[in-house]
Design a protein with these regions (language model features):
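An amphipathic, aromatic/His-enriched active-site/gating alpha helix that lines ligand/cofactor pockets
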Residues: 24-38, 54-94
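Absolute protein N-terminus
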Residues: 1-2, 102
């Protein structure tokens, strides 16, 4: 089992709009079979205005398939709508992948 963590450093004051996008995306992703996503905002972190998403996958192949974003045409249209303006909210980011040992 693997833990996928995306860490996004938002532009000042842009965490809330990005969080709303990701809440909707998490709901859509669950419908598309991605499983449950956790969303976290910083109380105290490496940088201010941080949003972290986490989800678990059984193997990296599953993650690669999820990353291809395949779904119904309606779902894909909705995902595209949700991602519009994403880059206007984010300054920088990174992805961490961990193997769950216990």
């Amino acid at each position: 089992m693997y833990l996928i963590r995306d860490i996004m450093y938002c532009k000042p004051g842009k965490v809330r709009p990005l969080l709303e996008k990701f809440k909707a995306m998490a709901k859509l992703g669950e419908k598309m079979g991605w499983g449950k996503m956790r969303l976290m905002t910083d109380v105290s972190a490496e940088r201010f205005w941080t949003l972290v998403t986490e989800f678990e996958v059984p193997d990296l192949k599953t993650f690669e398939e999820m990353d291809q974003m395949q779904g119904t045409p309606e779902d894909m249209k909705e995902m595209e709508r949700l991602m519009t303006g994403y880059h206007d909210l984010v300054d920088d980011g990174k992805r961490e992948i961990y193997r769950l040992e216990l």
